[in-house]
């Protein structure tokens, strides 16, 4: 790679970071490797300690995306700044109530949330979440404090280096083209490009509960680790996930 990764897509869970990443990946001037999409590098020590050359090895061009960078703002923002102080930051935001419900549904589906919605909120209020994964995934209330998280990025990057994208516009088909042209303009890339705005990151009830359990709660997927490259395992996992999702919605009691 000729230069450092220069674009980072950050934001709240379920706020459109993956969609922006996938749409940008269609552009011929942008390299957004699918195998490390949503890869926790700057905010997860185990990955960060592999070294920046490990991350850069996936890129021929200069764009990188991962969720939760904004939530772990101080840690990730500082590391991104130390890596590339001239980086451009795209921050994705969403109505915090809708975001919390969507995140809850997702973690129920992948078997990382077993409580009812009200029970999950109470556990967070009581301070019962301790591990990195719990703090990353199951903090439905804490994730809503966008102001503090944004201020952390403004501490390291100028306002001109930050562009905001709102989920409510991202899912509005009448605004998608304009939204992406604004993103391209922010990145100083030619805006006359027609994106394919296919549905991304579909959610729903798994078709096979057994397959879903094997994938998320057993060591079976890890058995392939010594034999299959990381990039292939990521693509295979994503494809299995897509094929096993039905159109039926997960119901949430918010009373």
What are these regions (language model features)?
Residues 16, 38, 47, 51, ...:
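Alpha-helical structural motif
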Residues 1-72, 79-92, 96-130, 157:
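PAPS-dependent sulfotransferase catalytic core
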Residues 46-56, 113-196:
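PAPS-dependent sulfotransferase catalytic domain
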Residues 10-13, 68-73, 138-146, 172-176, ...:
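Aromatic-acidic/polar surface patches that form glycan- and anion
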Residues 102-108, 128-141, 203-213:
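Noncatalytic linker/hinge segments flanking ATPase motor cores
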Residues 151, 155-254:
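The conserved 3'-phosphoadenosine-5'-phosphosulfate
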Residues 5, 65, 135-138, 168, ...:
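Residue-level detector of alpha-helix boundaries and kinks
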Residues 14-21, 44, 107-116, 139-147, ...:
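Phosphate-binding glycine-rich loops and adjacent basic patches that engage nucleotide phosphates
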């Amino acid at each position: 790679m000729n230069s450092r990764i220069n674009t980072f897509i950050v934001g709240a869970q379920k706020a459109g970071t993956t969609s922006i990443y996938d749409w940008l990946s269609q552009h011929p001037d942008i390299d957004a490797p699918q195998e490390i999409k949503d890869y926790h590098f700057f905010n997860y020590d185990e990955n960060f300690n592999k070294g920046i050359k490990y991350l850069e090895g996936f890129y021929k061009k200069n764009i990188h995306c991962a969720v939760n960078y904004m939530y772990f703002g101080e840690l990730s923002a500082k590391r991104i700044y130390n890596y590339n102080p001239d980086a451009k930051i795209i921050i994705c935001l969403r109505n915090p109530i809708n975001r919390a419900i969507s995140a809850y549904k997702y973690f129920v589906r992948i078997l990382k949330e077993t409580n009812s919605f009200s029970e999950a909120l109470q556990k967070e209020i009581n301070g019962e979440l301790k591990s990195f994964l719990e703090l990353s995934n199951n903090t439905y209330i804490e994730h809503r404090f966008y102001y503090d998280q944004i201020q952390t990025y403004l501490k390291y990057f100028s306002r001109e280096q930050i562009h905001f994208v709102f989920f409510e516009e991202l899912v509005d088909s009448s605004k998608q083209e304009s939204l992406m042209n604004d993103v391209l303009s922010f990145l100083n890339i030619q805006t006359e490009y027609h994106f394919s705005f296919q549905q991304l990151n579909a959610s729903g009830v798994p078709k096979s509960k057994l397959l879903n359990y094997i994938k998320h709660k057993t060591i079976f997927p890890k058995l392939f680790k010594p034999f299959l490259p990381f990039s292939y395992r990521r693509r295979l996992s994503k494809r299995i996930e897509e094929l096993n999702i039905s159109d039926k919605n997960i119901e949430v009691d918010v009373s």
